[in-house]
Amino acid sequence: MVLVTAVRDYINRMIQDISGMKVLILDSSTVSIVSVVYSQSDLLKKEVFLVELVDSISMSKEPMSHLKAVYFLRPTSENIQHLKRQLASPRFGECHLFFSNILNDTQIHILADLDEHEAVLQVQEFYADFVAGDPCHFSLNISSNHLYMLPVAMDPSNLQHYCDRIVDGISAVFLALKRRPIIRYQRTSDIAKRIAQDTAKLMYQQESGLFDFRRSETLLLVLDRREDAVTPLLNQWTYQAMVHELIGIQDNKVDLRTFGKVPKDQQEVVLSSEQDSFFKANMYENFGDIGMNIKRMVDEFQQIAKSNQKIQTIEDMAKFVDNYPEYRRKQGNVSKHVTLVTEMSKIVEERKLMLVSQTEQELACNGGQGAAFEAVTTLLNNENVSDIDRLRLVMLYALRYEKESPVQLMQLFNKLASKSAKYKPGLVQFLLKQAGVDKRTGDLFGNRDLLNIARNMARGLKGVENVYTQHQPLLTQTMESISKGRLRDIDYPYVGNHFQPGRPQDVVIFIVGGTTYEESRSVALFNSTNSGIRFILGGTTILNSKRFLKDLEDAQRMIRSSSTVV
């Protein structure tokens, strides 16, 4: 049930069975789908000598009859139009058409009519309509991710398109896994309900034959990001999550071009658990351990190189790697990780993130409103704290104490307004309208449910291994409830008459509004406990705090510019 393997198998079947020199033609979505599971060198081994985008190849007229064209596209009307133009005067010796999802009858008829020159040798559906960045974590890379926060009446056409894309992605995941799930959703979310119902309609009515798989011990749970707005607001201190938070990961690639003196061969680096054994072993480790593990590998090479250079700091490691070009050649991966850790250390120091993060974790995990107010006020007054960190601190305080301390919250709003040029308190108030206590179902701060209160007290008494990684996403509680058969029907209703009496074997949790790498780490750790249930996490995009705040701003701007009353 590993998604990376499923997507890789589809691509293998596309390019392996077609012999000879090939051009692979993709669209803006499938280029991401392919790039996270297949490297350029992998493609060359399969005789793929050219990779082109379908919209740019439409503009070229140069004949290439020596190449066989392998198209892998989403079945959209735009792509059908591109094919219409290209098949009218074929440039390639053969055309093989693969679509990442279900073609409708109209599209099939259009394609049949287009092929006047009989250039098309096959048309197939290969259900890889999602970006499988990690074995149990996928994204749909939806750019207009803020739409889930809008009232239905505001932009019905774009919202429909947004929901359709999500249903397409979810259905492709289950077709790739050869499962038809029982479907549940978060009761307090209209958009989660809509997507759950649309998915059920597709799987149990419109395409019931296609989804007629025997095994049914599978659950799809559709959640809303606003149920836990804390997780995407926090600074991160485990490797993969920290890289995404401080630098950014897009399709398993990290762009370092804007960072000072980065070596040319490391301006863009790949972070893939499938292609990088060091990253695979360390992606969920905390920042301090990463530094030690890199140092251990540098020490090993130092012995081989018989160098006496003292290595005690991250800067020492960076200098050592620069001085030994053969080290970079032999241990390219390690020098890449030295670069990443070096750049992140600079950001941590510049933004005083150890100070900021300690207060964030206190806000997310522990009580004590008075102490929290003092700590946030002190940081708002600290000139070294950035505007984005000030905003996140006020948001975290507001999510936790909106009902308990409205007077102090107003004082923090005023302080934020005077200290931050970019961010205003209106965005915090908008967050509370979207994700405040009145909108939530679950026990986000572990202070409603008696069992959660006891658990938090026990954790406090035992002490926490790392003050910066105390927080656990709400998703962890949800997975525990599912594994114990205690996910409440009243909070997470079933769609239709399809119920699940026992525990599911496989669970796909889809978060409308996006996932985080902290949550994907929780899923991976949960899967490693051998509980008998395999979890997969998916979402509309992969968030860091910057992206989450941008989505909030985009939604707020649209609502303000509309005359619709929220």
Describe these PLM feature segments:
Residues 1-566:
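Extended, well-folded catalytic/binding cores that form a central cleft or groove in large enzyme
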